[in-house]
Amino acid sequence: MPGLNTSLNIAVQALEANQGALNVTSNNIANVNTPGYSRQIAILNEAPTFQENNITFGGGVTLEQFQSVRDQLLQLRIYEETQQQGNSETQFNSLSQVEGIFSDPSQGVGGALSAFFNTLSQLSTNPTDANARQAVLTSANNLANSFHQAVSALNTIGTGLDRSVPQTVDQINRLTSQIATLNGQVAQMQGLGKEPGTVQDQRDELIRQLSNLANISVTQTEHGLTLTTANGVPLVVANQSFALQANANNSVLEHVYSAQGQDITSQIQGGQLGGTLQIRDQVLPQLFTQLNNLASQFATSFNTQHAAGFDASGNAGQNFFNPLPTTTDAAANFGVAITDPSLIAASSDGSAGSNGNLEQLVALRNQ
């Protein structure tokens, strides 16, 4: 039979093993709010048995190792959601600025249009009122300024987005370089039979940060962890990183290039960088087109109706706004063509007190 010392040794060994397990639990609790931390578990194994007098006795328990608990599918889902979050937040911030441009009642185009039609309505009640005529010209110039301010504000947003592209690319390159280094450390520790849990946690957190910046794909290969863009452009392979580049080249705008020199700007869809490029390359051009179309169509329609009337001297009406032959840069070139209030063609029959043409001009508000 085993002696007292053997029994005591088994008991001590059991206490040490379970103390180690308690330490793991305490460490898990302490790191509950640590970004990237993965819960660890203690692996307890039966100690080697021993024989005495042809009888086999148990050797107790040993603490084999600590092991991080990872759900790879859940981790990939976190990366996907983080990409979407980065993309959505970037677009929301940019669109909030755009909304301010058009919804501002004091400076927005919509508010300026309403104010302009209000002054036309007031003039229609007394077409010979010089002050009311001057108010129409003043509000018309305010409308022109609102178009110019909208163009300037959209350009400012676009410039800010464009400048952020190389900054985001630099962030991506720093993260991929750090991830590649940690990849090498993980491989080295695994080769030595060590548990790389802490290093893997650090790597997972960096990958999460990276996924907030761009759409990435994470795969485990025989060479270790591999990161690519969603379209397969390599970012990290084992302990080697591949830096992206951002430059304008022959373009006015910043483009993103792979380490091999391929323009991958259009391939980047997710993360902050994807959101930035989507607003810059798709949303803003559409807004410029809509703004220019509005300026061109409004100026053309108003000029056509204005020319159908007569001014205070009984002369045929002329262009009220500067003619805009094309929609290109129409908002930037929008302006008032007349400076003399008496040239406002209020009359429909040439008589001084007629407001017939003004009523037709006011009716354009509903078109």
Where are these regions (language model features)?
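S/T-rich, low-complexity, solvent-exposed segments of bacterial secretion/appendage proteins
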Residues: M1-Q367
